[in-house]
From Swiss-Prot:
An annotated GO BP: DNA-templated transcription
EC class of the enzyme, as a word: transferase
Species of provenance: Francisella tularensis subsp. tularensis (strain SCHU S4 / Schu 4)
UniProt KW Ligase keyword: no
Enzyme Commission numbers on file: 2.7.7.6
Name of this protein: DNA-directed RNA polymerase subunit beta
Amino acid sequence: MSYSYAEKKRIRKEFGVLPHILDVPYLLSIQTESYKKFLTADAAKGRLHSGLEIVLKQSFPVESKNGQYELHYVDYQIGEPTFDETECQVRGATYDAPLNVKLRLVVYNKDALPNEKIVEDIREEYVYMGDIPLMTTNGTFIINGTERVVVSQLHRSPGVFFSKDDSEEGAFSARIIPYRGSWLDFEFDSKGIIWARIDRKRKFCATVILKALGYTQEQILENFSESKTITFNSKGFALRLDNLSNMKGELLKFDIVDAQDNVIVKKNKKLTSRDVKKIKDAGVDSVAIDFDLVSTLRVAKDIVNEATGEVIAYANDDVTESLLESCVEVGMLELEVIDFITTERGRYISDTLKYDLTRNTDEALVEIYKVLRPGDPPAAASVKALFEGLFFIESRYSLSDIGRMKLNARLGSDKVSKDIYTLENSDIVGVIEELINIRDGKGKVDDIDHLGNRRVRSVGEMVENQFRIGLYRVEKGIRESMSLVHKDKLMPKDIVNSKPITAAIKEFFTSGALSQFMDQDNPLSEVTHKRRISALGPGGLSRDRAGFEVRDVHATHYGRLCPIETPEGPNIGLINSLASYARVNDYGFLEAPYRKVVDGKVTDEIEYLSAIDEDNYVIAQASTKLDENNHFVEDLIQCRSGGEAIFTESSRVQYMDVSAKQMVSAAAALIPFLEHDDANRVLMGANMQRQAVPTLKSEKPLVGTGMEKIVARDSGNCIIARNAGEVAEVDSNRIVIKVDTEKSQTSNLVDIYSLTKFKRSNKNTCINQRPIVNVGDKVEAGDILADGFATDFGELSLGHNLMVAFMPWNGYNFEDSILLSERIVKDDKYTSIHIEEFTCVARDTKLGPEEITADIPNVSESSLAKLDESGIVHIGANVEAGDILVAKITPKAEQQLTPEERLLRAIFNEKASNVADSSLRMPSGTSGTVINVQVFENDKGGKSKRALKIEKELIDKARKDFDEEFAVIESVVKSSIEQEVVGAKIQKAKGLKKGAILTKEFLATLPFSKWLEISFEDEKLEEKVQNAREYYEEAKIAIDAKFEAKKKSITQSNELSPGVLKTVKVFVAIKKRIQPGDKMAGRHGNKGVVSRVLPVEDMPYMEDGTPVDVCLNPLGIPSRMNIGQILEAHLGLASYGLGKKIEKTLEKTRKAAELRKTLEEVYNSVGDKKVNLEALNDEEILTLCDNLKGGVPIATPVFDGAKEEDIKSLLKIGGFATNGQMKLFDGRTGKPFDRHVTVGYMYMLKLDHLVDDKMHARSTGSYSLVTQQPLGGKAQFGGQRFGEMEVWALQAYGAAYTLREMLTVKSDDIAGRSKMYKNIVDGKLTMNVDVPESFNVLRNEVRALGIDMDFDYSSEEE
């Protein structure tokens, strides 16, 4: 087994028995693949049925109303973005690129005859069609400078669905849902009548739709019912028994007798195949029936007197005596009737036709028009156009390929081609037929929560739909422009206005429900947000009306959606996460991978199955035991089939799970011993990992699952080598790799990776990358070169390993509180850096422009000490609450001055009183260090000193970076040429003869530019040198071009909002240590609040004097049933013990042979998966041992983790008791505790619920306008509400003075509170109470009722 660069430094011991069959697919592919399909910019000529291309093809050509112009689509191009991703974030711009569409305007001769078109001219050009946001490499969008994610939506798939309303007997319904267009419903009522609805409007008879399609009443009956022939004469009535086989299974309503009056089949019996044979053998072809039965029948076809052409009866008329008499009169002795006798099937349509008052197609169309457009007078043309536009015109109605596939599959017919996306007559007839079958018990209703009936709409598809909406508006505009613009040489640009497209796309990305501000607490929260699947949003469910069934876990979720990870609260079950191995197929259905089983042997062939396909197969679990030939060991195997768990013979198994973790999401797969935790707690654990704050120093989990490196790799926060090579240069800002051209298919000799330093994330956490490679290290493509935030050697590291004791300590563990050791604070274990962005905007006001200046009235020198001459804070300044960050003055209205004031103004040249200080200050309760300042201003007034200084610094840095980059390229080219040419024969060189041997010494005397002029006799060598020469020249040109582009983007003017003159952004880094009140959690849903930070000497300690780091309450485990944390603590202790063992060996010797023995015992004595230590050389073994001193990292995959015996064995090797318990001593008294305590290492996280962000106090502040009471909440700088129940409490104590204070001066007594503030300032401790404002509000409300209420002061005066 080969190890990557990072793995060699720290190998994770892996438990788990199951073989590794399939790598976890790229976690962000659901985002990147979808948008790639939409844009397909890199495969311009191969664009077929995807995204932009198909929308443009469907929308064009556009024809003018008079037919003179036609605008055709030819091709499109996506340009280059103006700024790169980083630049867009800094400037608050959108990362997008212009879309240019090539359009062809065909002009026809207007004098030509009506039916002939003579082309007069063709004009073609590229037309700008708005900007399309581009996706970053990590699957996000940058919109107005902020990173956003478009969440995929799970919605009802287009197609037909049959359901039953349980509130009413027989209330079955069918709904045809298109991808785009009107919904069509058919439903039964309790009487058996079939009704139709269009777009959930007023219902009408279903037969109206059939008539509107052109069917006559006779054809409708023929399609939906059987007919039988009745003969009649003087003896009575007889029913002909033709098509006997069709009557099988039906209930007979009469006796069948033979010629001798023997009963063959009795009345009220279901007809069987044997009965049919008996009837045929007896030669019975008809059976006598009485008139009572005949009178319940209806005519199947129109009855016409052939002699006169007169209609005696219409189809569906009741059979009556008078009708029979009329038939006898014209000599008709047999009658074709609808078969209600042997089957009830025809009655539904027949009864519906009785309710239907329309008689033909025209009347049916008018009826539909009245339903959809009530109040509009129906004109013949508009009536037909409306109906056709509903379901039969592709621009307005589309089932899409998914809808057509689902409709054909559900109706079990392929009559309609899969390329037809509108409804056909046969579709509607088929749906009604299937609905009748379901009502008759011959079909099943659909399960709407089955993942075969729900599909995923990803980002590309949503943007495509939005683009279509915009293009539809553009299309309307083009038609209008064609008829309005009168120009001799009309060009496509003149008639196309792209603003509707830009507006539609901008609206989607800025305010769409599924375009969300990216959750960026840590790399996991980013990955999870991009893999989220929401049932909410436009066209989806609403959380208020979603019932339990929709939210529940469904059998088809297995391997597709995670059954664990979903939010707590109103969105539970509506927002899900994609399972680790799941993918979305071309139709938008979720698929899960399985191993194919052939003749009882499990192969390594992988097949992805959708939920629909999976229903038909028997699938074994991943943990099913196999022998060495991959055959099943046991005869009876637990499997899944059709959504049920079953035991079945091994010969029946068709597929097998790929991995034990395939049913859970990436976040849940990070929880070790997940299988030992209660599901509710795992849900909390998975969600809380996303809230973990990245700490100053990242530390890998000692007990992991092996998923850590996959999440870290795919999150995009680490830097990954593009090509194999050698590390040439490393510093904190960049890594330079000299590429190994033999291993890598690239012409580049050098790869340069720039690192992100101290960048603010969406959640104000700090993004910082650190190199983990050293100069001279050999790396392969795909190796981790630098860690991102919350990663450690390429593994996700959200928290720290702490020594935990499960024991109470003086009540400080009450209600899940956590007791922490002061060592954790001293070692900065949970210290995190948060970067806050403060923005100051100078606007142009009515009274004049606001100004950012250091000259501010009535502000002391000390307050301005941290500002530069432009009035902006210096980088590196330590700022406290209330400090000025950006000094700004705002003009205020001029007041009338007395002559004396004017004179004083003139003498002292004072202009200060007509401006107000509106500076940006540091908010209360915060302090930190200024790490960056950005200034954006309009170029009209010229740039300020600070802006020019920042610009110069950025240009100098860019120049330095590019010079260094070129220097590296030059040195690499130089060394590669030197290796090849020293000792070669010269063809031509200044200072040497032809045929001379080139030496190192001669090369050293020449500048590098002269090296490139030397030519050689050896042709192959000459070719190599020529390639290096060309690469060098191209690199020089490319770097100069890159620098010029960078310089242009730095100096480019900023587009500020209207009325804004200048924007200053100040970034302040705030260091937050852990303190009481902060929330912490483990990975098993075991959360709590830090109650006290205890000095190290008071903490309980072990026999060797080692103090524990954390005390947790043991009562938090039994009722929560998350036993995984105990197992994690035990295994963590074993891991720590193994680390100590390696450390002791290192102290004794640094010989690789001895170390290998220890490592062999540590890694390979327990568990099935062995570590190949032979793959590491002696130096790598030493490095590995140095990195393992703190503990040997262990991977215990979910559902395939370490067993109890494994943990005990490891504890034994690590030198601990196998029960994981030990004697602890009280740090205060030195006495041992009464019982042994469970102690172990647990991975704990600090969550983004910090007490600093919640702590808040107020004396005076803002008040509500109406009630004049203080506002609420920290954001409004509000007060604490003293509510009704609190008032009762004070009343109960009789604290009258406190109560008066609370209800008046501290609340809404305006005059009283002003007076009180003045008294406090003056040092007087008296309180005057006035009328509270709430009384005035009440008085005004009573006045609204016409009652005047006022205080009566007369009694006091008397």
